[in-house]
Structures are given as structure tokens and as C-alpha cells.
From Swiss-Prot:
InterPro entries found in the cross-reference section: CinA, CinA_Arc, MoaB/Mog-like_dom_sf, MoaB/Mog_dom
Species assigned in the record: Pyrococcus furiosus (strain ATCC 43587 / DSM 3638 / JCM 8422 / Vc1)
Pfam families: MoCF_biosynth
PANTHER family with a match to the protein in the record: NICOTINAMIDE-NUCLEOTIDE AMIDOHYDROLASE PNCC (PTHR13939), NMN AMIDOHYDROLASE-LIKE PROTEIN YFAY (PTHR13939:SF0)
This protein's name: Protein PF0476
Amino acid sequence: MFAEIITVGDELLTGNTVNSNSAHIAKKLTERGYLVKRITTVGDDVEDIRSVILESLNRKPDVLIISGGLGPTHDDVTMVAVAKALGKELVLCEKCLEEIKEFYERLYREGLIDDPTLNDARKKMAYLPKGAIPLKNSVGAAPGAYIEYRGTKIFVLPGMPREMKAMLEEEVLPRIGSKKFVQKKYLAEITDESKLAPILEETIKIFDVKIHSSPKGFGKFIGIIIFAQDEDTIKKAVEFMKSKGIEFREGW
């Protein structure tokens, strides 16, 4: 199973905002046994977003998660781009509109805003691609969307980290299933990653594992993450590498 992630926002490209969403989504997908093959960041432009969505769909991922650009402002255009990419029209989601209305009325009652009126900017967030299943935003206003398209499960989530994390946990992860999978972290006692590389390559050829290495500066250790379908396979891979003269400490 493989997945791709698209994050949307000019602020991500200018460096004004750290793209923590992509790291969080990738970690959650990896924990579910998905191989995240690509993370793409794109600005707030309809055609640019449409283009990267189509590029991703051409690679036929099992899951595509898009985050950002669902708010009420002029540059929140992700739903428009998704609809264009899929050849669908945007339609009003009445349930979403009611939830948005209730959200702003609650903020008004709490004294956080001075006007709960559903103006055009707020109504805009209730439009989803035709046929999409709305995803409830339990901590914010903008709903997300779930669309199955030619074998790919597409999820469109808000860009605000708190909203994205809640929707990911409550609406996305229950829909994507998981694959049995184990990951273990080790510190390899070797100072030169180039000397470790051929041993890792040989290990991957022999055992059904994926291995990521992460040098810890020019110190004594190199961080290793090993992924496999069961812990026994990881143990065998580690023992093999130990037989090549590499010592390991579990954990980082």
C-alpha cells in the first residue's frame, strides 16, 4: 500500500510557516503500514493545485491526502482545484452549511466574534465536489471531503494543524485500514555511513525489510529504522548485520 501527501499554502513555500502537517500525516500513514512515496507542497493557485493532484492520481496511490486551503478567504481554493481535477462541479452541502452556522453561533455566544452571520465567505466552505462525503471538523469551521476516484481514496483536510490532526484521527484513519507492520529503531556503532551502506543494501536483498539510516553528525553512532511485517524478521536482519561486524543499540 502506498500513499501520497499534498500540502497547500503560499506560506509553506515562503518559509513563513513550518510544514508540520506533512510530517504528522506521513508518520500516521507509516504507522498504518503505508509507504509514503511522495510529499508535494504547492501554493494557493487553482491550476497549480489541480496539476499536482492529477500528477499524483496518475501514479495511482492507494491513498492521497491533501491538506490546506479550505478556509473562507480568497486564496482558499483547494476544493475548487479538487473539483476541477476530478471533472466534478462544486455543490452545496446542506449538512456542512448547518454545522458551519452552528460553529459561528457558538463562537458568538462565547464572545469570540461579534457577528455570527453566514456571509458568502463562510458559506463558501460548505461547497464540496459533487459526490464527496463530508468529513466533520470537530474543532473548526471548514469541513473536509472524502472521494473515491479510480481506486484512490482522496481525503481533503484543513491546513490548521489542530483541525487537521482531529480530522485525520476521527475521519481518515478509520477509513483507510492498516497493514500488519513493525518498526524498530537502533543506533549502529559505526562512524562512517558510506561503510554501512553496502551492508544495508545486502540486508535489504536478503530480508523482507525496509531500512532508513540517519547519521547523527560525525559521532559514534548512525541511527537506523527497520520496517518489516513482523519483529522476528527485524531480529534476523539485525543479527545478519551484526555478523558483518556492526554493533547495535536498540532505540535512539
